[in-house]
Amino acid sequence: KIRKIVFTGGAAKGGNITPAAEFNIYADPEAAKIVFDSGIPLIMCGLDATLKCNLTRNQIMKLCQSGDPAARACGDMAGYVLENFSKYRCVASIHAAVPFMYLIHPEFFKTEKVFLDVECSDGAGRGATLCDFRWWLHEEDEMKDMILTDADTESFQQELFEAIYSVSECKNMK
């Protein structure tokens, strides 16, 4: 039995592919709707938190210049994100790491209980994640979903760096 699903995607306060929708949910809102309606408790790691889970240009350069192969590879990938997807090219958000970081260090994040849904109709709202914070409108067991609303950037960065450098340490232990 699946106890919960922790996923990267969605946004409570506006999207990145349209004003309303975040890319992952927008790409297939019907599939997201199936998951959202599954009854399995969801933890949404959306843009509200993932945009705060980033690396700075200087941190990325440090990774790229490292003698550690894992660090260099991570630096190259983050550098690609910085140059191609970061409008002002000062930070690169590391969206995909957030669910893992949340599972290991939930204390790095603020959360809020919500009722999640997704807009599947055509039009400007297609793919928008609907986060209903109005607990008084739902039965207690309906408010099973949570969203990450904020993140401790500094703690995220420090732990991510430690994890990246520990990859080579683990390899050397064999």
Task: Place the predicted regions along the sequence by residue.
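Conformational coupling and interaction surfaces
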Residues: 26-28, 45-174
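Active-site histidine-anchored catalytic micro-motif
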Residues: 1-52, 57-58
